Amino acid sequence: SKGTVKGTINQDYTFMQEVEYILSGVVKVGNGNIAIASKAEYDAVVAGGVSLTIEAGTSIKGAADGVLLVTRGSKLIADGSSSQPITFSSLDEGFNGYGEWGGVVFQGFAPQYGKGDTGACFNSGEVWCNVLGEGGDFVKEYGGNIAGDDSGIVRYVRIAEGGLIAGPNNEI
């Protein structure tokens, strides 16, 4: 059977192997991609974190605008196996394309390095900071000072054909 997923997953949820899931638009796991300005807001994001569990052998297909966005404080538990990998791909049958859907984005409270690093994550004195992510306006905020931040498990997972372009030098 098939099931279309869209919007925000705001409670613990499991994708089951017997269903082929289609990501339509941006599918957010949790609501942690907001700008955090206080310890109370940070605590609320952490307390509101949810887990999306994907069973081994599950197939997830992204529509042209499909993106799975795992926000700060939430987790993706995608624990496949060598005989039953979890597969993310586009709607077509082949695995030979690129840019056919968005992809999978992990945000979190880990330090941000590289392009766009303003040093804010290291100078704020807080466990959170707010870095605008690449890939489009929907990505919003991520980042923090927790080097051991954990956004879940990704084991025996194939991610094919992704790469949404939001603008020049701005893509997933």
Language model features: what each stretch is:
Residues 1-172:
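Beta-strand/loop edge motif enriched in small/polar residues
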